[in-house]
Amino acid sequence: MSLITINSAQKLIRSEVSKFASTQIETAASDMERDGCIPSGILQKISQMGLFGLIIPEDYGGSGLDVTSLCIALEELAKSCASLAMTVAVNNCLVNYPVIRYGSAEVKKAYLNKIAGGSIGGYAPVSDIEVVGRECVLESDGACRYISNRYDIVLNSALADFFIIPVKSDQGVSLFLIDKGMQGMNSYAVSTMGLRSAGIAGLEFKHSELKTGMCLVTAESGQQAIQSVLDYAHIGFSAVALGLMQASLASSVKYAKERKQFGRSIAEFPMVQEMLAEMKIEVEKARLLIYEAASRFDADEEYRTIARIACLSSCEGAVKIGLNAIQVHGGYGYVKDYPVERYFRDAKSLQLLGESPPEMRLRIAKEILL
């Protein structure tokens, strides 16, 4: 009996997303990376499938599904294109989740319905709370506040209709919902190592007004809320890493069987077999951790520590497997004719965009030392 059990609805999600990804995304992934964007037709199809609003309650037009279902969808998407999977992960984990959990009735009605209808949200990732907005200038003019600041990494920024932005003040860190095009806000391109079509870009604010109604989480509870959002995102990011791991392994197995040296396939060489075995071990270890974390969240059980462990294991495993995949491919692993160099760059980028590995290890240690 498998330790991971999925129901019929979740099996259907896996089947539908897998079919969509393998037939429409896999062949387009290289072009998307080259162009640095996801075609509007693909984004529209993702919206029609309900993936942008997968965790949004049905009352707001979403799919109302659980985290296990989200992980299944992200895993299948990432097998074909990690950038697209990351776009969906950010929308659900870093945008939908905080709006669902912390938004007022008015905010939920205004934003969740838009997302379920196809809108995309951006999020400025927070790793070290102490350096958020270190150059942030907040000015007050009576009842109004104005922000001047730069955020060099904003996830989904190039695709987003609105953003969730952390703002640091003397009272702490607040989260604000800011619509695209507000006065004084400008977007600028950034060149990334990996996840090149995921819409990562920068945002700059010059004396932009922050109205009271734009505040999602106040400074008094901002740090706790940000950590809660990160804890949730660990599960989704882990699923993206799992898909990347499987793509690297599948490409390596295929190449090893086809590549001939000294009159036989390199799959017969013990050193290649050892690398493939290590890759498979990492995949299955990550799979168990990820779906355990997801099932605990869905059962309303304590999940944060296992989610951090899953995120560490899967993201570090994806980098390790990516390196092994390049080794298996030899010189071809270095060229863009084969996808493994992209898998590696995407894996390394994914590892750096969430909570940093040292921070997660410290939090795990604190939990077990309580």
Predicted features, each with a name:
Residues G117-S127:
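A short, Trp-centered hydrophobic/proline-enriched beta-strand micro-motif
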Residues A143, R150-N186:
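A short core secondary-structure module
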Residues A116, I129-C136:
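Active-site-adjacent elements of ketosynthase-type condensing enzymes
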Residues I100-G103, E139, I165-K168, L177-D179, ...:
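Short beta-strand-to-turn element immediately C-terminal to the catalytic PLP-Schiff-base lysine
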Residues N91-N96:
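Well-ordered alpha-helical segments within folded domains of soluble proteins
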